[in-house]
Amino acid sequence: MKFEVNEVRIIEEEDGFKYYGIFDKGNKDWYEELKKFDKDTLKVMYNKDSYLVLSVDKDASKIAPTKAGDVVEEIKYQEVELAPNNYFVNSKIVKLKECETIKDGKIVFERDKRIEQIKKELSELKVEYSESEFLFKGKYWQRNREKGDRDSLTSLILLLTITGRKETNEWKLIDKDTREHVYPTLTLDDFKLMAFHMQSQLSKALKTESEIIARLKTLSDEELKNFNSRKEFEKLWKN
């Protein structure tokens, strides 16, 4: 049994009493039709365009279709957990998974949306890995942030080059063993080596991101659904 609302209009009886009449395309009255539903089934009301479940109840009289496009359909009784993401597809109540939508009454996986989602995750991982600290000269930890580290190092190398100074103890590092801030004396060549490490790490992060992105369009829907950005980034990073 199924009832689809086509029109809602005000009905006035002979005694002047008015109420909203609910009718299908055949002009059948909802208040009469609801009596024809099986008493033991679950009645599901959903929107015919979005398939979003609006209400469920075993008692058809407790279902209240109020506008055109509301559909009431009965299915075998089952316990249903009320949720804002319940949809009625192929006579079943389902929950859409991430990056799924409904088109023409069928659940469809949104590949492009999932790919863009993965790209965003990869972009964040690129920054995380490119800016992670690295071991310098075997005894110091150095971060690789664009604003706080790479830009400052470029300025310092330029200053030392212009002034002709060969070394300085103005650069802050982290001691490998104590994790305390230290200011060792470093030469211009030390800073150039540090800059090389920074650029190499940044380039590796960019390359890792690009290689993974290039693979995405070749993956199946199932592979995209189960794609773990961090796991794939780490795997390629270690190679």
Name each model-derived stretch.
Residues 81-82, 87:
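Extended alpha-helical coiled-coil "stalk/arm" regions
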